[in-house]
Amino acid sequence: MNTKLKPFHFVLLILTLVFFSVATKVRASQDTSQPPKSLASEILVLSQNMEVGLEIEARSPNTSWARKGAEAVAVLISVDGKYNQDLLLWAGDEWFRYRVMLGRILKGKHTVSVTLNTPRSAAAARSAEVKSLRSLLFTASPDAANASEEQLAVAYSPFLYARANTIDRFTDIPLLTYYEVLREANNDLVVRYTTVFTNEDGGTQTAALMARWGRATDIEWVYQIRLHGGKIIEETYQGVEHETKFFTGPRTAGNHPLLAVASENNNFSDLACSAVRFAPFPFRARLETATRESVMDLYPQTYRVMAEELIREKRISDAPADINTIADPREYLYIEATSEQEGAALAFDVKVNGQFKSFASDMGEPRLRIDRSGYFRTAVRLPRDISPADVETITARCHANQKPASERRCNRVNVVRALMLDQGYVPRVLPLQTQPESSLGPDEIRVYRVGSQQ
């Protein structure tokens, strides 16, 4: 998301990262009077070099991402006694299968251990349970030319240093990492990695996130490789202020790039580091006809922890009064649509049974309309206790915007999905009238019927 970080602030942030790295290491050393509690371990016997992931089914009793001081237990993952990464059990009391990337491990016998990391855990979060460990093994290809798309994606997935001012604060943590495989016109192959964070402490305000993006998590592309003729010709990442930069930083566990979260809106640096690092295991997402937000639908817990962080940070209210506050995310209708904008922007109105007025995604604010093209989401706040069966219509409306343009139209408009979150934060898709794409001029509308009455 857009935010400004001046060069001085960036230098200060890097210095802060170094300071926190030293400070947190000192703190950890002060808490070693008792050996860390082992939760689980697994012996790996590899007949060849492998890229290894780990699935950990775990829970942390009596914790909640919403409760200050009891947010989560941290566990430390090591390979042959050496630090690999930390993992925060952000799903709390619920059993959840966390997947992490360990990196390339050489042929032979190895021990993977998961231990309680008390210094990194919340003050009132002191226990964790591990039901199972499962290794995820991928043959390590000797070079990019002979690797499959999956082998490439696994071998180059990034490890992320935590932003220093998030350590022990349980904010803006990475939840999921996915990758896309893109084939471009010049026959280049691009593998791009994107991470879903719980939220962003800087950048777009919460209500604007919901209106323009249909979520309050932060979703950022992190890193990508470009291949031509089977050879990697370029590695880039998203730098501070959304600048695309060439990756020249260090690597770990094979070819995995080390990047640090380096700004309040979760952009990255290949120079900084901190005392804590994460490596969510990447899964493939096919988003040619879907939004980035749709990956969250596969893991409903991400909606819950999104809401819990907002609750803890006092950004959820029964009566939102400013741009940084929203209602309970379960009180919104989430609309997934597609359009190609030319000097125009889209907004949506929702009509519900028994309500005289419609409810608008832009809340009457032109800056909350959607002016980007492609597939996108928005979220429309509805009255409390409205059920999916109460939703009658969704109206798309096109508006001219202030950007220079030879023509002003919303082209190829279509609403493709509508959903609401149930009480357990599970997305429930609403029946939606199927319509062909349409083009709208300024002030023109298109109505889509919702529900069984269509």
Tell me the role of every PLM-derived stretch.
Residues 2-12:
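Bacterial N-terminal signal peptides that target proteins for export
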Residues 11-21:
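Bacterial N-terminal signal peptides
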Residues 26-30:
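Boundary at the C-terminal end of the N-terminal hydrophobic targeting segment
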Residues 31, 35-45, 57-138, 356-391, ...:
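Beta-strand-rich ligand-recognition modules
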Residues 46-49, 78-82, 103-110, 182-189, ...:
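A short, structured loop/turn motif at beta-sheet edges
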Residues 50-54, 331-333:
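Structural beta-strand segments of beta-rich domains
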Residues 56-61, 115-119, 192-207:
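Generic short beta-strand segments
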Residues 141-151, 183-190, 196-207, 211-221, ...:
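Domain-length functional cores that host ligand/cofactor binding and catalytic or interaction surfaces
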